[in-house]
Amino acid sequence: EMCIRDRKVAIVGYTGAGKTTMVNLLMRFYELWSGQIKIDGVPVSEMRRSDVHAMFGMVLQDTWLFDGTYRENIAYGKPGVTDEQVEAACKLVGLDHYIKTLPKGYDTELNDRSSLSAGQRQLLTIARAMVENAPMIILDEATSSVDTRTEVLVQKAMDRLARGRTSFVIAHRLSTIRDADLILVMDKGDIVESGTHEQLLGKGGLYKELYTSQFENK
């Protein structure tokens, strides 16, 4: 049993280890076979799925955009959001200047075929999550498809998004989660190690193997 309120929790492991399944269980896309996940002391199995989903903001590796303006894309699913809130979120993630150089600024049309880089798409999704202002955040593989320079920008934006919230981070690049309050190491669907970055390196187990292999391959 563990309590993770207002903490940054990283979930790591090789491909197929069960990281995404863990996130799906948190959000009740899947049902638990045993055990419980509680939010504010209430088992998620006793909550409506829509209520569980509303508690999470998500930043995914495969970001999606719909036909509409930048403003509409960022304010998606949040009635009553003001222009000021949208622009404030974009300033925090570093998108405001770029959007204001466009012909119609925030009212420029945007769709899934727009020539945005992978990093810009992720920054837009982070701005969307900031506007959504959910108490918990899931960052799923959020820096695996961007170059190192863009990764720094995305990482700073994610850190701002996660501040003051409970956050769950799944990342291929373990350098991005060294500051996590808790790291869960998964293998074949089970949590096999847990602790901080320093604690897990000291154990010399699977986490150290994962971490070391990334730097050996550079």
Model-predicted regions and their roles:
Residues E1:
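Extracellular interaction modules
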